[in-house]
Swiss-Prot record:
Keyword Oxidoreductase among record annotations: yes
Listed name of the protein: Shikimate dehydrogenase (NADP(+))
Active site, renumbered: 65
Family to which this protein belongs: Belongs to the shikimate dehydrogenase family.
Assembly and binders: Homodimer.
Summary of the function given for this chain in its UniProt record: Involved in the biosynthesis of the chorismate, which leads to the biosynthesis of aromatic amino acids. Catalyzes the reversible NADPH linked reduction of 3-dehydroshikimate (DHSA) to yield shikimate (SA).
The keyword Ion transport is annotated on this UniProt entry: no
Gene name as annotated: aroE
Record EC number: 1.1.1.25
Binding site for shikimate: 14-16, 61, 86, 102, 215
Organism: Psychromonas ingrahamii (strain DSM 17664 / CCUG 51855 / 37)
Length: 272
């Protein structure tokens, strides 16, 4: 069997082994998938050992995505733009390729939920690594406008500079946001701390899709707040997690698993 893994610290909360085991069963691919937690200063050594011990590929989560970016011998275009790597693959030629499937996972989940991206007006809250990882794939869907709002305005401006050639992207202060949005994505970790980003309630209409990249067994604080403002269609990041994993699996094995089926099983697993 071929060996795959997820690297992170901490890693015990990771759902990746559960997800990829289901993918393997679904596609009848013979793989073993484990979770590895190196010390924060020992990541590259652990990665080297993994590939020396017949590892074929791995997922990377916090806090190692930037280090994985540096470790990769080749980068895909989307990984280069994202400035971070969440998927590594060892090719038959012995080359380690770095990719970033986060944005593809988000877009897949949005499409699976019948969210129209082409011609839409999108607000992306936050300008950290999570936001940078999804800007390219979102712009590839040709939205009318992608606006980034962040507490530190200069960080939002930096992202617009990186992605300006890919589509209509701009930065905006929270206080200057206006009009209504078709899709509002929260890429910050505010929900993990029980907080809600400071955006005006007038930006949300009943038809606005609300997407929090965070997830939990309960409704996230951001999604609960949006629901109070009248939003009827809210999604959390669990589907993105499964979607990016499906993309990684396809990169490694050449077969795309059914993310919807595994998402349903994972949600049931979280609820029990």
């Amino acid at each position: 069997m071929d060996n795959y893994a997820v690297f992170g610290n901490p890693i015990k909360q990771s759902k990746s082994p559960f997800i990829h085991t289901l993918f393997a069963q679904q596609t009848q691919e013979k793989i073993v998938y484990s979770a590895i937690e190196p010390a924060t200063d020992d990541f590259k050594t652990a990665l080297k050992d993994f590939f020396l011990e017949q590892g074929k590929g791995c997922n990377i989560t916090a806090p190692f995505k930037e280090q994985a970016y540096q470790y990769a011998q080749q980068l895909t275009e989307r990984a280069a733009l994202a400035g971070a790597v969440n998927t590594l693959k060892l090719t038959d030629d012995g080359i380690i390729i770095g990719d970033n499937t986060d944005g593809a996972g988000l877009v897949l989940d949005l499409k699976n939920n019948n969210v129209t991206l082409k011609g839409s007006r999108i607000l992306l809250i936050g300008a950290g690594g999570a936001a940078r990882g999804v800007c390219g794939p979102l712009l590839a869907e040709h939205p009318k406008e992608l606006i980034i709002a962040n507490r530190t305005f200069s960080k939002a401006q930096t992202l617009t500079t990186i992605f300006t050639k890919l589509g209509n992207i701009s930065a905006c202060e929270f206080s200057e946001l206006s009009g209504e949005f078709d899709l509002i994505i929260n890429s910050t970790s505010a929900s993990l701390h029980g907080e809600v980003p400071l955006i005006g309630t007038k930006l949300i209409r009943p038809e606005t899709t609300i997407y929090d990249m965070m997830y939990s067994a309960q409704v996230t604080p951001f999604n609960a707040w949006a629901k109070e403002q009248g939003a009827k269609f809210i999604l959390d990041g669990l589907g993105m997690l499964v979607g990016q994993a499906a993309e990684s699996f396809a990169i490694w094995r050449g077969v795309k698993p059914d993310a919807k089926q595994v998402l349903n099983e994972l949600r049931h697993h979280l609820a029990t």
